Design a protein with these regions (language model features):
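An amphipathic alpha-helical micro-motif enriched in hydrophobic residues
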Residues: 44-52, 56-82, 90-97
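Single conserved hydrophobic/aromatic residue that forms the stacking wall/gate
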Residues: 139-149
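Charged, compositionally biased N-terminal leader segments and the immediate start
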Residues: 1-26
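Active-site flanking loop/helix segments enriched in acidic
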Residues: 21-50, 54-59
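Amphipathic, non-membrane alpha-helical segments in soluble helical-bundle scaffolds
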Residues: 5-12, 34-41, 60-67, 86, ...
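N-terminal cationic and glycine-rich segments that engage phosphates or anionic surfaces
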Residues: 113-134
Length: 149
């Protein structure tokens, strides 16, 4: 059993620590500690679809819950990678922060000179990745959500 003091306010760091505790090989939750990327892949997709349903419904209570579930999935997958020694939450956050700065040269002066003349998010994304992303080409993003499987 893990000592844990309930808090009035939780942070993203608390969420990471809770997932680490649940996955602890000795004292963790039997279900959580055996999960892999493949075994919880469907959960990630389901939680994402539920978050989109909440957004479509413009329901703030539902959005708060479902966005939390998506965040938990991101942290769960990240902790699996942390256990493998490949990356951790700090690296995930650094990656997305660097990406946002790079793709907003009109806002962040440090990236303005490097990206002068490129004025669209997609063009900056393609420059950054060196390719065009096709992930959303299979999804009708303008339509209300529906199961993808």
């Amino acid at each position: 059993m893990q000592d844990w003091t309930p808090r009035e306010h939780y942070t993203a760091e608390d969420l990471v620590e809770i997932i680490r505790i649940l996955r602890d090989g000795e004292n963790g939750c039997p279900w959580d500690k055996v999960q892999t990327h493949a075994s919880i892949r469907k959960n990630f997709l389901e939680e994402t679809c539920e978050a989109l349903e909440a957004i479509d419904a413009d329901d703030p209570v539902m959005m708060q819950e479902e966005l939390g579930d998506v965040l938990m999935q991101v942290v769960f997958h990240t902790v699996i990678e942390e256990e493998r020694g490949r990356f951790d939450m700090e690296k995930v956050c650094r990656e997305v922060c660097e990406k946002l700065v790079f793709r907003h040269p009109n806002i962040f002066a440090s990236s303005a000179a490097e990206n002068a003349g490129i004025n669209s998010w997609d063009a900056l994304k393609n420059k950054e990745k060196g390719r065009t992303t096709l992930a959303l080409s299979l999804i009708h993003i303008s339509e209300p959500t529906r199961p993808l499987y």
